[in-house]
Each structure stands twice: as C-alpha cells, then as structure tokens.
C-alpha cells in the first residue's frame, strides 16, 4: 500500500512546484462578468469576475500595483464605467468589506483593468481588491422618509438656522443656510457690509431686527447642541442688498477655517436684568445686574456714567418707577472689588455681561416717584367696569327688592296675636276702646278694621270675645293638660 501512495505524493509535489514557478493555473475570463460585492451597493465592494461558471476575487497585488493608494482615479475609470457607475474614487485592498472564506483568488498582469492575463493564486490567503465608484444619479422618486435635521428636503424653501454656543442666547449665533438640499455656513470677508442682510435674516427667523455682528471670539466657541461644530462653509454672499433669499448667496466648494457669518438679533434671550439696592426704596440705589433668571446679582461697573441718561432711564422703567431724577458715580472710597461690565448703551442691547475683577465703580441712581407707580391702565379699566356693572344691577334689581322687603314688613305687622300672652294667661287685645255691634245689613267690606278679629262672622253664634270666655271657662273648671280653646291650640302652634 505504501508503494502505491508514493507516485501520488510525487505527482502532487510536482504540481506545487509548477504552480509556484509559473504563478498558478491560467484562468480564461473571456466574455467575463464583473461585479462588486460585500457592501450592498453595486458601485462599491470587493472586485469579482466570472467566466460564466465560477466567481473569482481579484488579488490585491494584481497589475503589479505595490501601492494602490497612489493610483490615479482615471486609470481605473474603465472599471467603473463597465459597472455602470460614475467617476472612480478609490482602488485598494478590501479589508473594509466582508471577505468570503475559501473564495478563489486570481492575480492579473498587464494593463490596469485588463483580465486577459490572469492566473489562479494558490498561495496563502491574502486581501482581495476593492473598488469604490460614485453612485449613478437616481431616476426614481425620492424616498418619503424625512431627511436629517441638518438637511431639508430639496423642495423645501430656503431657511436659516442660528447655531449658538453651549448655553448661549436664543436669536444669536453662527448662521447656517439651507437651500435645495444643501446646508452650510456663509463665508464673509472683512469688507462685507452685512447690515441689510442681517435685517433680512433676523426677520426670517422672527428674531426682531439686526443688532450687531457676532464677535469672532464668540463665533469660534459656537457648536451644535449635539457636540458637533457648525457645518463647513458652503455659501458666500452674492448680493448683500438682496430682498429674496435665493438672490443673496451662491454655492462654493466646502472649506473649513474661514470666517463664517454670525450675528445677534434684537430679540435675543435672556436679557440683562437690573435692580436698585441700598436706597430708601426700590426706586433708589446702586445698580446691580444679572444675565437672566437663576443667575447671581452683582454690581454694574460703569465708568462712562456721565455720557448720557438712556441707560438709567431704562433702569428706572424696569423698576416700574418714574423718569430718572439723578445719577452719580460713587466716591473712590466706595469702590467695590469687582462686578459686571457691559459696553456703553442701554442694557437691553447688552447680550453678554463681562466680569470685571477690580476697580469696579458703582453708579447710584434715583428715579422720580419713589413709591411704586399708580395703578396701571388695566387695573383702572377693571375698576370702572366693576362700578358700571354694580350700577346696572342696582337700577334693574333695586326697585323689585325694595318692594319685596316692604311687603314682607307689612305682613309681619298685620299678623299680631290676640289672646293669652304668657303663663299667667293675661289677656292681650289689639282693639279699639269701644266695640260697636254692627247690623247684619251693613256692608262689612265698606268699613276698615285693624285686625281680623274685630267682629265675628255674619250669622254666627260665636261670641265677640272668645278669648275672654275661654279664660273664664278655664277658671271655673279644673285645669288639665287638654284645652278646648281654639285660640290656645292656635297659640301653641304659633309658639
């Protein structure tokens, strides 16, 4: 048996020797089919060819290229064109794409992109060749999914976005412009006049009017909330006096490092807040400021306090006081150690308070009407409307209520009790001093009586003094808990 295996082993060794000397078996790839695999895209992936029966990966050292990174893209343009792709981008090893285990490799020689002289590689497993080309333009409708937040729909109207520094202001920052599916910042030159353009941008963002350009030191610190820097410059100013956004800018090649357009609009938030402390009331004292709610109050340092009253007039209005009465810088002996400084001008236009470590000079401001201003227009109108409503109610409901009260009082006066008034059974009469027996023919309705017991009903056998007769009857009989008197029963019910 061992003697039979020796010729086979010798034949195998001879085949390996021939392969190593000749570079492998020659593979016929006439009428080849070419594809890119491992990426899911037909224009990027591992380069593979087929002769109609089997697919082969192309060796990364094909065509004698020791460094494929230095290959000019035009040299493998033909490969991209045969794959029905656009311009070539990269030809390199396929380490970035998924490899297929035990796939056969071919190594080709001659002109780059030619498969006329290829042989099967039987050496150790090496990287295959990868090709990346530009995708062809889409001919189908765009997907219905919404685009990323940084890039609007191609059909969306032009728009702006302000990118502020972390924790920065609203309506202030670096301007990003989006139009036709392209988004980026706007490059400017020092000589550019952006006042009119700034008005257009602030109005489009509903941020009021243009206030001033964003200082370069702050512009360099701006970054997106996600932690990314603003987009690269892709636009430049074409017409600073434009009235339509489409006419303002033109596209440029993306570049980083230039100065991008940044601005501050008048409606920036939060605004600087002020108060007066150390005086007799809230309308008098030295000025303190802070940059929004939740921030600490500190002294306003102002060395230019004698240049105008506009800043102090605004401070008085914010305290809901009258006009400024006087203002003065405090004596040098009263200087504080530090505080906040803001450039000259009204505080509502000061977008950032700068800290001053020393030599901070305070300003003492006195406003007119040291007490709080009177009621506002809204409160006065509310009081007037309330008084008018009360007058209408009195006119409409007053007479009716008066009549009801008078009627109730008269009824109470007429219903006075005639009969025993206490435990001693004393008599109480509400009658005239004399009683006149009226004839039956007299018209009872023609005479006025003071109460309903002035005379008995007609054709009645009841006495004119039933209460008196009842009292005499009780005296003559033994007292008990029962009573035959209608008046006593009536009295008990009333009590």
From Swiss-Prot:
Residues 403-495 are cytoplasmic. Residues 475-495 are annotated as: Disordered. The keyword Phosphoprotein applies. GO terms for biological process: apoptotic signaling pathway; T cell costimulation. Residues 1-23 form the signal peptide. Residues 34-134, 160-266, 274-368 form the SRCR domain. Keywords: Cell membrane, Disulfide bond, Glycoprotein, Membrane, Phosphoprotein, Receptor, Repeat, Signal, Transmembrane, Transmembrane helix. Glycans are attached at residues 51, 117, 323, 369. Disulfide bonds join 43-85, 80-133, 108-118, 202-265, 242-248, 283-321, 301-360, 316-367, 342-350. PROSITE patterns: SRCR_2 (PS50287). The chain crosses the membrane at residues 373-402. It is a single-pass type I membrane protein. Residues 475-484 have a biased composition (Polar residues). It holds the Pfam family SRCR. The modification Phosphoserine is found at residues 439, 460, 483, 485. Phosphorylated on tyrosine residues by LYN; this creates binding sites for PTPN6/SHP-1. The modification Phosphotyrosine is found at residue 453. Residues 24-372 are extracellular. It comes from the Eukaryota. It is found in: Cell membrane. InterPro entries: SRCR, SRCR-like_dom_sf, Tcell_CD5. One of its GO terms (cellular component) is external side of plasma membrane. The keyword Lipoprotein does not apply. May act as a receptor in regulating T-cell proliferation. Interacts with CD72/LYB-2. Interacts with PTPN6/SHP-1. This is T-cell surface glycoprotein CD5. It comes from Bos taurus.
């Amino acid at each position: 048996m061992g003697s039979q295996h020796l010729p086979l082993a010798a034949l195998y060794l001879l085949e390996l020797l021939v392969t190593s000397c000749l570079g492998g078996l020659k593979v016929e790839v006439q009428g080849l089919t070419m594809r890119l695999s491992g990426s899911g895209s037909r224009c990027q992936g591992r380069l593979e060819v087929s002769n109609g029966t089997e697919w082969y990966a192309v060796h990364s050292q094909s065509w004698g290229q020791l460094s494929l990174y230095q290959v000019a893209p035009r040299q493998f343009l033909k490969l991209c064109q045969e794959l029905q792709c656009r311009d070539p981008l990269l030809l390199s090893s396929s380490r970035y794409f998924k490899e297929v285990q035990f796939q056969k490799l071919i190594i080709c020689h001659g002109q780059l992109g030619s498969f006329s002289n290829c042989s099967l590689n039987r050496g150790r497993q090496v990287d295959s060749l990868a090709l990346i080309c530009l995708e062809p333009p889409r001919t189908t409708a765009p997907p219905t999914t919404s685009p990323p937040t940084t890039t609007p729909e191609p059909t969306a109207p032009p728009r702006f976005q302000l990118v502020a520094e972390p924790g920065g202001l609203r309506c202030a920052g670096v301007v990003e412009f989006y139009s036709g599916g392209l988004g980026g910042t706007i490059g400017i030159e020092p000589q550019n006049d952006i006042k009119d353009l700034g008005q257009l941008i602030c109005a489009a963002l509903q941020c009021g009017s243009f206030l001033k350009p964003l200082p370069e030191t702050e512009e360099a610190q701006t970054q997106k909330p996600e932690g990314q820097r603003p987009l690269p410059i892709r636009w430049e100013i074409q017409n600073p006096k434009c009235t339509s956004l489409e006419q303002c800018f033109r596209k440029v090649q993306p570049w980083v490092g230039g100065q991008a357009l940044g601005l501050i609009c008048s409606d920036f938030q939060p605004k600087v807040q002020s108060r007066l402390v150390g005086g007799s009331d809230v309308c008098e004292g030295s000025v303190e400021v802070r940059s929004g709610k939740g921030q600490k109050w500190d002294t306003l340092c102002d060395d230019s306090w004698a240049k105008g009253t506009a800043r102090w007039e605004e401070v008085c209005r914010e305290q809901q006081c009258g006009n400024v009465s006087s203002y003065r810088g405090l004596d040098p002996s009263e200087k504080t150690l530090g505080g906040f400084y803001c450039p000259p001008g009204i505080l509502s236009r000061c977008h950032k308070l700068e800290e001053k470590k020393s030599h901070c000079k305070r300003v003492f401001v006195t406003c007119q009407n040291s007490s709080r201003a009177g009621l506002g227009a809204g409160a006065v109108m509310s009081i007037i409307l309330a008084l008018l409503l009360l007058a209408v109610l009195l006119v409409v409901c007053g007479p009716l209520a008066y009549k009801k009260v008078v009627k109730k009082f008269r009824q109470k006066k007429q219903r006075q009790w005639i009969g025993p008034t206490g435990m001693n059974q004393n008599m109480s009469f509400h009658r005239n001093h004399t009683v006149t027996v009226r004839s039956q023919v007299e018209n009872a309705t023609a005479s006025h009586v003071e109460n309903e017991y002035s005379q008995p009903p007609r054709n009645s056998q009841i006495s004119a003094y039933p209460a008196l007769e009842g009292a005499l009857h009780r005296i003559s009989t033994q007292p008990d808990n029962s009573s035959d008197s209608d008046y006593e029963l009536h009295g008990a019910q009333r009590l």
